[in-house]
Design a protein with these regions (language model features):
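Fe-S-dependent hydro-lyases/dehydratases of central metabolism
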Residues: 1-686
């Protein structure tokens, strides 16, 4: 085992001595190591472990060890992630290329089964489910069946790959969202294994084929989203080239006040970091406020790193990390390994620690966070809930001005023609009477036509999910209902969410307001919101209405959520439920009533908003380790639709397919490699 730097050391965990490349030992040679940001310490260990004198040299290690926080990035280094995560939309091409490489290997007379990922690769199928059915008890089953019909060949290919390739696993459809499954189950935090026959440990690091891979930063794991070529290189054990980055420190103090959520916090942070400008930079959170921030909140923040503009948004490992690992069913041996390694490696955070040195520092007192939304077109455009109505009306006026001027011009022209035309007399721009499901109602500009509890950004967080359920319960007790034009949906990022909603019996209240589970996948967050009811969509088109959506997602660009929905607002799950009840954006939820109870008394948001203490009590009583253990004990097996697929076996993909995404399994690009043996990468990526 190479140790040219003289930094090999040992620590004890689970009753045995385990080797590691020691940052404290390197600090004896480079004093600056002690004050490096935690994220750069992880990168530095990576360089030390893969230092080979050629691809990665002692000079590379020294350059990072002596990091200048104010220097513009110029020094290129190689980062070798420990594993790769993929989703089905961007991950399929990588597996197609592996299949094509096997074809090429076979054509050259080699052993096709030698082509395998060298680094662990795990693909979660979550990007294909759409909300075709909603608002009914069988919506989940119906959407699942439609999903399999639409993706039959792709899914058969991935199921074949699951059995054909070593070091490659597939989480089947209808299981969860990649980043939430990664957080709750796949992540190791600290890897252990043998290097040259000796027990060793090293940090869990990764790249993923999805920009929100950074959700795992909340667990203290360094990783981010990359393109397909980089992901394939990482799967084959190759390093990724990068410049030593600048690191922005984000200091958190205090506690979140009553009535606010992690969603409000992350929208505040998004606005601050967008104004700062952090493209190409790491963001690292520190400060005593971390001790009051549950890991689920940290994951929500890490998830939105792409919206910040940063490469990653990481939290250090600390007691909260261990608490979450225990809750989510990790073994006692894993917990001891993580803590022992992090402490030995100076990767463990305490409030008493001296702060690392950063390129620049932003500060936020959590007590200053207030209820917020973001929209209507960008996640960084935060709107205070108290100002949401006026802000919306101002933005709506800008959007409808041209339409209304053109309509008025047409009306004036028709009015001068005579003949009793009704255009000028009856038609109101941006409004129409609609009949749907035996109800007739006026649909107009500002109507909320989609209300979606969606995205791992928020569905990974029990506080906001149970908060939504409590609000639904309170609203139901007051006799409030969702407006008939609102398409409601609930798409959890893992089945654990369903388990604790059922245990708490809050699923009944959400379903009573139309929030039935429609799938375990990305759905509305990535634009798979499905069709609107035909009468509603036709009215929006014909009358050029400015329709709205409210979702607990992470992006809200115009047209992303639905082609006919122009204004999209990001909000916490409880606010999604509240706006579904209101049915419109031109409402002041702070001062205007949501509706009336059966006796005609006004009901305000404050009357149904969940109490923070009650949310915590629900978490303590209903979110259990046993739920995680049960759901993830068979996470790679899939349901009957997956198990019953007609899938080929063997080392080669043998199906002739018409699917464009699978056509390149016999790609001609592989044929010019020439005769002779194909060079194989070595285990250490050389």
């Amino acid at each position: 085992m190479r140790d040219e730097l003289g930094c090999l050391d040992h620590f004890k965990a689970n009753g045995k001595e385990i080797g590691f490349y020691s940052l404290p030992k390197l600090a004896e040679q480079h004093e600056n190591v002690k004050r490096l940001p935690y994220s750069l310490r992880i990168l530095l260990e990576n360089l030390m472990r893969f230092e080979d004198g050629s691809n990665i040299t002692a000079d590379d290690v020294a350059a990072l060890a002596n990091w200048d926080p104010e220097a513009e990035p110029s020094k290129e280094i190689s980062f070798t992630p420990a594993r790769v995560v993929l989703q089905d939309f961007t991950g399929v091409p990588a597996i197609v290329d592996l299949a094509a490489m096997r074809e090429a290997m076979k054509a050259l007379g080699g052993k096709a089964d030698r082509i395998n990922p060298l680094s662990p690769a795990e693909l979660v199928i979550d990007h294909s489910v759409q909300v075709d059915s909603y608002g009914q008890a069988d919506s989940l089953d119906l959407n699942n069946q439609i999903e399999f019909k639409r993706n039959k060949e792709r899914y058969a290919f991935l199921r074949w790959g699951q059995g054909a390739f070593d070091n490659f696993k597939v989480v089947p459809p209808n299981t969860g969202i990649v980043h939430q499954v990664n957080l709750e189950h796949l992540s190791r935090v600290i890897f252990d294994g043998e290097i040259d026959g000796k027990p060793m440990a090293w940090p869990d690091t990764l790249v993923g084929t999805d920009s929100h891979t950074t959700m795992i930063n909340g667990l203290g794991i360094l990783g981010w989203g990359v393109g397909g070529i980089e992901a394939e290189a990482a799967m084959l054990g190759q390093p990724i080239s990068m410049l030593i980055p600048q690191v922005i420190g984000f200091k958190l103090t205090g506690k979140l006040p009553e009535g606010t959520t992690a969603t409000d916090l992350v929208l505040t942070i998004t606005q601050m970091l967008r104004e700062k400008g952090v493209v190409g930079k790491f963001v690292e959170f520190f400060g005593e406020g971390l001790s009051h921030l549950p890991l689920a909140d940290r994951a929500t923040i890490g998830n939105m790193s792409p919206e910040f503009g940063s490469t990653c948004a990481i939290f250090p490992i600390d007691d909260e990390t261990i608490r979450y690992l225990k809750l989510s069913g990790r073994s006692e041996e894993r917990l001891e390994l993580v803590k022992a390694y992090a402490e030995a490696q100076d990767l463990w955070r305490n409030d008493e620690d001296v702060d690392p040195v950063y390129t620049d520092v932003l500060e936020l007192d959590l007590g200053d966070v207030v209820p917020s939304l973001a929209g209507p077109k960008r996640p960084q455009d935060r709107v205070l809930l108290s100002e949401a109505k006026n802000t919306f009306l101002h933005q709506l006026s800008d959007m409808t001005k041209k339409r209304d001027n053109e309509r008025n011009s047409d009306m004036d022209r028709f009015a001068g023609e005579g003949g009793g035309t009704a255009v000028g007399a009856t038609e109101v721009p941006g409004a129409a009477e609609v009949t749907y499901k035996d109800q007739t109602f006026l649909l107009k500009d500002g109507a909320v036509v989609i209300a979606a509890i969606t995205s791992c950004t928020n569905t990974s967080n029990p506080a906001v999910m149970l908060g939504a359920g409590i609000l639904a319960r309170n609203a139901r007790e007051k006799g409030l209902t969702v407006k008939p034009w609102v398409k409601t949906s609930l798409a959890p990022g893992s089945k654990v969410v369903t388990d604790y909603l059922k245990k708490s019996k809050l699923d009944d209240d959400l379903e009573a307001l139309g929030f039935y589970t429609v799938g375990y996948g990305c759905t509305t967050c990535i634009g798979n919101s499905g069709p609107l009811p035909e009468p509603i969509e036709e009215a929006i088109k014909e009358h050029e209405m400015v329709a709205c959506s409210v979702l607990s997602g992470n992006r809200n660009f115009e047209g992303r959520i639905h082609p006919e929905v122009k204004m999209n607002y990001l909000a916490s799950p409880p606010l999604v439920v509240a706006y579904a009840i209101a049915g419109r954006m031109d409402i002041d939820l702070v001062n205007d009533p949501l509706g009336e109870d059966p006796d005609g008394n006004p009901v305000y948001l404050k009357d149904v908003w969940p109490d923070a203490r009650e949310i915590q009590d629900f978490i303590q009583s209903n979110v259990t380790t046993e739920m995680f253990s049960k759901e993830y004990s068979h996470v790679f097996e899939g349901d009957e639709l997956w198990k019953s697929m007609d899938t080929p076996t063997g080392e080669m993909w043998s199906v002739v397919t018409e699917s464009p995404s699978l056509a390149s399994t016999r790609a001609p690009v592989m044929s010019p490699m020439g005769s002779g043996s194909m060079p194989m990468p070595s285990k250490n990526g050389g």
